Amino acid sequence: MKVGIDAGGTLIKIIQEQDNQRTFKTELTKNIDQVVEWLNQQQIEKLCLTGGNAGVIAENINIPAQIFVEFDAASQGLGILLKEQGHDLADYIFANVGTGTSLHYFDGQSQRRVGGIGTGGGMIQGLGYLLSQITDYKQLTDMAQHGDRNTIDLKVRHIYKDTEPPIPGDLTAANFGHVLHHLDADFTPSNKLAAVIGVVGEVVTTMAITVAREFKTENIVYIGSSFHNNALLRKVVEDYTVLRGCKPYYVENGAFSGAIGALYLEK
């Protein structure tokens, strides 16, 4: 069995390959000792690690492991997944939306990191908790899917009520900027959480589009653990990317790009 692991700040992503079959699993980083114990019980032919906590795992296992830079691993794994899922892109920006967000440009040969922002899954969980008192990520994202942002976010069309706006009316003019106009509204937890996911998705997309224009590509690929159980975030980034004139791509199992890539990089 071959194992690739991306040990991130919040989640540990694990892929196992055996008999041409690939299986995926995740574990919370706070349970890293359990992952180490599991690894020490397996018959592993090849073990490759990446991510901020890769060194912690390597120091506590009884089998040899190779460690790779997470940006290179993510790019390698993403290329594999894009090919497997039928996407033939000459170049692209990829946004890895984990606890925070890292932005990269792939020119057809190699990747380079071109930016990063603190907006991502950490904001969804942290700000989401402050607004709802919900700590469980699945419960939080489940609730957000049914939310309505209309009384919370100020859209361009809300400003240009009787006039044709100079930019698309569905663009957000101010996240949470409509709240004071609707103080009599019922701001349900679902609505507030949907607005949190909205601002995360729009900030990530805006930054991705900015660097895409800088590098003269229209292709933006979105990956990362923040999309898990979060159809709303995927819809926000896809719709907003199209609205801003670029082409969005979502990759199934994209959160495992680093784990897959580590397994296929060679030292």
Curated annotation (Swiss-Prot):
SUPFAM superfamilies linked: Actin-like ATPase domain
Q: Which UniProt keywords apply?
A: ATP-binding, Coenzyme A biosynthesis, Cytoplasm, Kinase, Nucleotide-binding, Transferase
Record localization? Cytoplasm
Q: Does the keyword Nucleotide-binding apply?
A: yes
Per the UniProt record, which EC number(s) apply here? 2.7.1.33
Catalyzed reactions: (R)-pantothenate + ATP = (R)-4'-phosphopantothenate + ADP + H(+)
What domain of life is recorded for the organism?
Bacteria
Q: What GO terms fall under cellular component here?
A: cytosol
The protein's role, per its UniProt record: Catalyzes the phosphorylation of pantothenate (Pan), the first step in CoA biosynthesis.
Q: Which family does it belong to?
A: Belongs to the type II pantothenate kinase family.
Q: What protein am I looking at? A: Type II pantothenate kinase
